[in-house]
Regions:
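Short internal beta-strands
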Residues: 36-43, 134-135
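Short, acidic, metal-binding catalytic loop of nucleotide-sugar glycosyltransferases
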Residues: 24-33
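Short aromatic/hydrophobic "clamp" motif used to bind/position activated sugar donors
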Residues: 105
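N-proximal low-complexity "stem/linker" segments adjacent to membrane-targeting elements
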Residues: 1-23
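A glycosyltransferase accessory/donor-loop signature
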Residues: 1-4, 10, 166, 171-324
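Active-site-proximal specificity loops/subdomain of glycosyltransferases
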Residues: 55-98
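Conserved donor-nucleotide/metal-binding helix-loop-beta segment in metal-dependent transferases, i.e.
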Residues: 112-149
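Catalytic metal- and UDP-sugar-binding loop of GT-A-like glycosyltransferases, i.e.
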Residues: 108
Length: 324
């Protein structure tokens, strides 16, 4: 039986989200394949692992393993100006070392639900040279003006053409090892961490272009995108497939119909904020996963996190106002 490996990286705050994501992934899994799920972490406790093992254990063609990545914390601890990044992003760049037993692997965030099988993505680009594959932005990138102060025009152009979402990726581990590209990625990250905007995407684009491939848009669809009018959007000008507005709108509608991974980006998540777009889909998935009791148990923790974020925003606004 062919094995489909996929890894995730998160801390203990995302155990509930991971349980829901894992259950939806395996509900849609193809019975012809065996799915090996890996969790790269540094702070999960045995009871966290047991909960996730219970979810995955319901599916005969799947298993979950946990990789303690503490050895990478030494390098992470020495980085400057990293406070606005989660260290989990660093592990996405070190997959070739973390998984020496595989030639390729999938990666996914856990603030997601899956509505179709991920296996077809694993077999893409069989005869092409590539290091990473992911979805490129379908809408115009509003982050690019932020790059002008820290990146050269040539770097900005490369990022514009080769930026991919780091929320779902296919990674060619065999080629990364053969070409010794992982050390280049991690060294670039260390040297440039103070200027990176979207750290994984920036590193991948600037270090590995043009050997990057693009997945179908259906592999990462953000929940809020369901509330956009496809005929009124500003589309990514770097994608020639979107040059015609009618074709672009048709592509957008097709993406929404065929979504594989539904992503909930941002600080407000469906497990901590019931007004999150497409909350209904996530809470239904939570019930199907048998995790409603855990969802209710976690609410005080999530409320405390929201209060901390709220107080931090008030503090920043207050002191920014005084500075003005």
């Amino acid at each position: 039986m062919t094995t489909i490996p996929i890894f995730f990286t998160f801390d203990h705050h995302f155990v509930l989200a991971a349980g829901v994501a894992f259950h939806t992934l395996l509900e849609k899994a193809d019975a012809r394949y065996h799915y090996n799920l890996y969790v790269v972490h540094t702070d999960l406790k045995p009871h966290h692992m047991k909960r996730l093992q219970h979810v995955v254990g319901r599916f005969p063609n799947a298993e979950v393993a946990f990789i303690d990545a503490s050895e990478y914390d030494t390098g992470w601890a020495g980085l400057r100006h990293k406070s606005h990044f989660s260290k989990e992003i660093f592990y996405k760049l070190t997959a070739a070392d973390l998984f020496p037993q595989y030639d390729r692997i999938l990666f996914s965030d856990v603030d997601v639900i899956f509505t179709d099988d991920i296996a077809p993505a694993y077999f893409l680009f069989p005869d092409e040279k590539f290091y990473y594959a992911g979805t490129r932005p379908i809408q115009e990138n509003n982050n690019l003006p932020r790059y002008r102060a820290h990146f050269t025009p040539e770097e900005i152009q490369t990022i514009s053409q080769y930026e991919i979402s780091a929320g779902f990726m296919l990674i060619n581990l065999k080629l990364l090892r053969a070409d010794y590209r992982q050390p280049q990625l991690t060294e670039f990250f260390r040297r440039n961490v103070d200027r990176l905007i979207l750290p994984e995407q920036d590193c991948i684009a600037l270090c590995l272009a043009p050997d990057i491939r693009f997945l179908d848009y259906k592999y990462v669809v953000c929940a809020a995108q369901y509330f956009n009018d496809p005929d009124q959007l500003r589309y990514n000008p770097n994608n020639p497939l979107l040059a015609d507005r009618h074709a672009a709108a048709a592509c957008y509608r097709k993406m929404l119909r065929e979504v594989v991974q539904l992503h909930y980006p941002g600080a407000d998540k469906p497990w901590n904020h019931p007004l999150t777009p497409r909350f209904d889909l996530w809470i239904r998935a939570c019930r199907h996963a048998g995790l409603m009791g855990y969802y209710l148990q976690c609410q005080p923790q999530f409320l405390l996190q929201r209060l901390k974020r709220y107080n931090l925003r008030r503090f920043i606004r207050k002191h920014t106002g005084h500075a003005q």
